[in-house]
A protein has these predicted regions:
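Membrane-interface aromatic/basic loop that binds lipid-linked glycans or pyrophosphate carriers
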Residues: 117-144
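Alpha-helix boundary recognition
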Residues: 15, 38-39, 84, 129, ...
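Active-site-adjacent helix/loop segment of glycosyltransferases
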Residues: 35, 39-120
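A short, conserved alpha-helix in the catalytic core of glycosyltransferases
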Residues: 1-51
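Short glycine/serine/threonine-biased micro-segments
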Residues: 2, 54, 125
């Protein structure tokens, strides 16, 4: 697994128009890119000697609450979209419907216990549901 924050790409071998899937935002674009490069017989090298210290969310000036909402929404939206893209909508639905139900249950349990993490599960459920019904990745800071 190669994470996007540590990729070096030879742009001579990649068509810039096809670089990233325009539908994906924030998560899974790096994995999708590697999968497409591999499918097109491009070489992907991994050097296990390299180490990258990735400090998440440091490139944004969003407050933690807004970023947490966006992060959780897009994490679930992108997982479903990616799985659907490579396996079809039926298999994606079969795999992710239980996750949707569990996420909703966790949300309600956390609401009852007045746990502040309930917002995380609310946005996970909303992101997953949006992807399942075919909505584009739309949640951005200005929408909150």
């Amino acid at each position: 697994l190669i994470l996007g924050f540590s990729m070096l790409i030879n742009l001579k071998n990649v068509q810039i128009n096809d670089f990233f899937d325009k539908n994906i935002f924030l998560y899974m674009e790096d994995i999708d890119l590697c999968r497409r490069l591999d499918k097109n017989s491009q070489t992907i090298l991994i050097n296990k000697l390299f180490r990258v210290n990735h400090i998440g969310a440091k490139s944004t000036n969003l407050n933690n609450e807004i970023f947490d909402k966006i992060r959780n929404w897009h994490w679930m939206w992108s997982q479903y979209y990616f799985f659907k893209k490579y396996n079809g909508n039926f298999l994606a639905f079969i795999r992710f419907f239980p996750k949707l139900i569990l996420t909703i249950i966790k949300f309600y349990i956390l609401c009852i216990s007045k746990n502040k993490n309930k917002i995380r599960y609310k946005f996970r459920a909303k992101g997953l549901f949006s992807s399942m019904i075919g909505k584009k990745s739309y949640l951005r800071p200005e929408n909150l």
